[in-house]
A protein has these predicted regions:
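One-carbon transfer enzymes
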Residues: 1-233, 239, 274, 281-318
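A short, sequence-level motif marking secondary-structure junctions
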Residues: 244-251, 291-297
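Low-complexity, glycine/alanine/valine/leucine- and proline-rich hydrophobic stretches
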Residues: 250-290
């Protein structure tokens, strides 16, 4: 049995490490070239792990280009894991592994098929998500389900904390099924039919904050798009600021009667610098900005952020 691995995102690292530690016959890992990975959110360096286990690492521009397809065919792989890879694989690429290719999608399929499921569930304020290990098929996220893990979402989660749990569940699900796969078995069950819409792709420009939303929606947007993603953003005093961290002030705690959405109420001051920030009114209630960064790299947090003379100023959409 000859196994291959395709991945560039950090969510694939724990699973690959566990598979290699188990002594599975991984003969090649494919990842993105550094100059391509540099523009992708959540990209991880697979070189140290491959060096540690002596596994050949191949850097590609696209998994579907002729060079990558020739490489895969030449490797003569029986089974390929595609974990932490955002590109849809072409039918010809999928056909290059004798037994098929296995991927993971960060939702409880068939719900939330499509792009950026982690970001979308946080933006929508959902309380439960999950991860699905599937056989890759020509249709997007439509292959047979091998295993699933349910993951609760708390109000304190961000895209980063959710991705940590997704990465751990990738590892756990793969290790549960690996012995069967190495015996040549093909476990899985068809997905139920779903009429739900496929989640659309997200782009950096989609992170523009709409202060006319409820405070909870603004808070959800910020935690959904924080690092390793490009971040939610807005304009104040003619400068574009990315909001990396915020706190929600619901109900009476964030009362904003008579204030326009986007108006800065003033600072939060505390001996605990991590609690310092600036309070901004939303359509109802408010959020406290805890960490912001200007386009020129100026990072404000703690006391430095609280001491900005922003009270009475308003965030706008540029």
């Amino acid at each position: 049995m000859k196994l291959g691995w395709v991945g560039f995102h950090m969510e694939g690292i724990p699973a690959l490490e566990a598979v290699l530690e188990a002594g599975a016959p991984v003969v090649a890992v494919l990842t993105l070239k550094p100059e391509v990975a540099a523009s992708r959110s959540g990209a991880a360096d697979y070189r140290p792990l491959c060096r540690r286990f002596g596994v050949p690492l191949h850097e590609v521009t696209s998994i579907n280009d002729p060079e990558s397809r020739t490489l895969l065919q030449g490797l003569g792989l029986d089974l390929v894991f595609v974990i932490g890879w955002s590109q849809i694989l072409a039918p010809e690429t999928l056909a290059s592994a004798r037994l098929g290719m296995i991927g993971a999608h960060a939702s409880l399929l068939p719900k939330n098929r499509g792009s950026a499921p982690i970001n979308w569930v946080l933006i929508r304020g959902e309380h439960i998500t999950g991860n699905s290990l599937i056989w890759l098929a020509n249709a997007v996220d439509a292959g047979d389900v091998i295993d699933q893990t349910e993951l609760p979402i708390t109000p304190y989660d961000t895209c980063a904390t959710l991705y940590e749990r997704v990465a751990a569940s990738n590892r756990d699900m793969i290790m549960r099924v690996l012995p069967r796969l190495l015996r040549g078995e093909h476990p899985g069950r068809p997905q139920p039919r779903s009429e739900g819409a496929v989640l659309p792709r997200r782009r950096p420009a989609d992170g523009l904050i709409d202060w006319n939303q409820e405070a909870c929606a603004v808070y959800n947007m910020i935690r959904a798009l924080t690092k390793p993603y490009p971040g939610a953003f807005g304009w104040l005093d003619g400068r574009r600021w990315t909001v990396w961290q915020a706190a929600l002030l619901p109900g009476a705690a964030g009362a904003t009667a008579g204030l326009a959405p986007g108006e800065v109420l003033g600072p939060v001051i505390s001996p605990d610098e991590s609690a310092c920030g600036q309070v901004v009114a939303c359509r109802s209630a408010a959020v406290t900005l805890l960490q912001v960064e200007a386009d020129d790299g100026t990072l404000l947090r703690g006391r430095q952020l609280a001491e900005q003379d922003w009270a009475g100023k308003s965030w706008d959409h540029g």
